[in-house]
Amino acid sequence: MTALSPCTLNATQELSLAYSMRLGMPQLALGGLSEAWLLMECGHRHWTLLERMLGVEARCMYDDRGCRMYASFVAVHESGASLAHFQEADEIVLESRIAALTSKRVLSSHFITGRGRVRIDMISAFVRKARPSDTDTEVLHGAEWDRPGIRPLCPLAEIDSSLPALDRQIRRGLDGDYMGLSLQPSGLSPAFVCRPCPAIDFNGVGLLYFARYIDFVDRAEWECMLAADGSRLATVERRIFYFANLSPGDSVKVELAGGPGSLGRMEHLSRISRVSDGRQMALVYTRKQCTRA
């Protein structure tokens, strides 16, 4: 990077990353591999590969109006082995690749291999703020960042991922159940409300960090559904669909449908919304498994 000009990247670099590492406490949680760390790491790798794809550093991405462009996640799917399969001092390999879905959306896939194998797919779209202080953003079209120095997105004919179809299904609207779960008021747990902390939950541009959404879901699960024996649950699958952000000082409300099942399983569908205006911020489907008998 030091040999390159401040705002351009080497166009000959491969649009993939791979490295191995040894797991320590920063990468682990009580139930195995830390899901929060994993999302943050894969998110960072997504943005790194996106810079290579467009040929420009993220801090230098501006649209045709001169507004800063941000790669905002719209959907994330985590699947594969339980995170409980990963333990301290394990050697893992993390492989990532990226491809354009459309002229305005990008998909990255990340494979974490150790005692088990986990896959995380992530879709992002470019957004901008009307003013730097805004938290609501608007999605940009390809022509709006068609500027010298930024390479256009060239969609692939075939994508090896189920996430685009899952995302389209959600954005058509939930008229009934999803994965056998319904968010009708009669089936919801008591609402969990909390106020995100600016020093912990927001990123450097003032937006609620994408990886924090599941923190609120897990806190709601812990407060509303679990007894002490729920501390050994580990995630097996997570689907996150993002719709909106919020301002520092605002609060979030989490509503859950579902709950503990047989054989140590947990499955629920959650809706995250803003307390200030009731706007839906995200829908999250979660499936977990107890790590002990």
Model-derived features with residue positions:
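Acidic/His-leaning functional-site neighborhoods
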Residues: 177-255, 261-269, 280
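Non-catalytic linker/capping segments at the edges of enzyme domains
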Residues: 1-37, 104, 129-205, 265-267
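Hydrophobic, proline/glycine-rich low-complexity stretches
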Residues: 1-93, 101, 217-221, 225, ...
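Intrinsically disordered, low-complexity regions enriched in small/polar residues
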Residues: 21, 72-75, 128, 180, ...
